[in-house]
Amino acid sequence: MLRPFLLLFIFGFILNLNSSVVEEFPYWILLEKGRQLIYSKEGFVKSNLTIAMNYLQEALLRKGIYPEANYYLSVAYSMIGNVVLEKLHLQKALENKDYLLDKFFEKNILFSLAKIAELEDHHVDMIDYLNEILSKFSDSDDYYNYHYVVQKYEDTTGNKFNMSFYLHSYLKQVRGTSGLDFTFNLYRFNNYNIIDAHQLLAKVYFKIGAYELAITHGLVAAVGILTRMYDYVSYYEPLYEFKNLRSFARKINEYTDIKNSFESTDFWEIVYNIAYATYSYDDGKYKSRAVDTWKLIVDLAPKFSPYILKSRIQIKDFLLGKSVH
């Protein structure tokens, strides 16, 4: 009888102590404490999450309008699977975006709303959120910043979302090189903060059958990941020059940290989806390019990648004259 009572007393004491401590902190410290508990190295601990939410709600109560607190509350609610409150706090954060101290924070809010729209199959909302990210957090030079900084395509003037030159280079038949090789030899994309937006746009455009846009955004995402890996390799070997994806993959594998970083990305999933969209694009005129891209995955992806088997199946179906699925 004494032990349950003692545990209850201790728990109550901790709660009272916590509430008294909360009262002493200014709102910005409450926000930071809540954020630290959410992203704690201990991982998901329900008690920590409850305390974090208390901190954040108190910070919001004190400041009144606090989009950062709304965002972190949305993260907390996503961790317990409460999509309704997650979305509500994200919408509130977006509504009060003008009060954000760090304007780039808006990108996280928009991307989270796009992910919820994906779950709800609201494709138009998803595309709108992602395009707003591109509109606010990228500029035209992000897409041209290699050989074609000066010599831009005429039809892209004043329209940074026209990235058709990525598609043209990928589909171009050049002897002795793959589509991805040729594209990466022409372009770099180092606005790493929006690679995920391009990746998600590629995914939704493929889902609705907009294959040209699916390929294009997928290529930007793939080139962005390769650009980052190229930067890492160049740190160790300043004179290194990219020749083709096969030799570059071998070079990446020479450095454990770069290899681990590369394998933590969704690169091979992106490339697989590029190939899939290519197969269906323009009434199947580029099936051979799709198959070549799947062959790259079979040859270069790490052995644990599920996209090796998927690519083999697609290649086999193509050779047998079956429809790709």
Predicted regions and their residues:
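Canonical tetratricopeptide repeat
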Residues: Y72, F105-N108, S112, N145-V149, ...
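N-terminal leader/linker segments that initiate helical-solenoid repeat arrays
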Residues: L17-Y55, L61-R62, E68
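Terminal, low-structured helical/coil segments at or just beyond the last alpha-helical repeat
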Residues: F248, Y255-S280, G284-H325
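Start-of-helix register in tetratricopeptide repeats
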Residues: W28, E68, L101, N108, ...
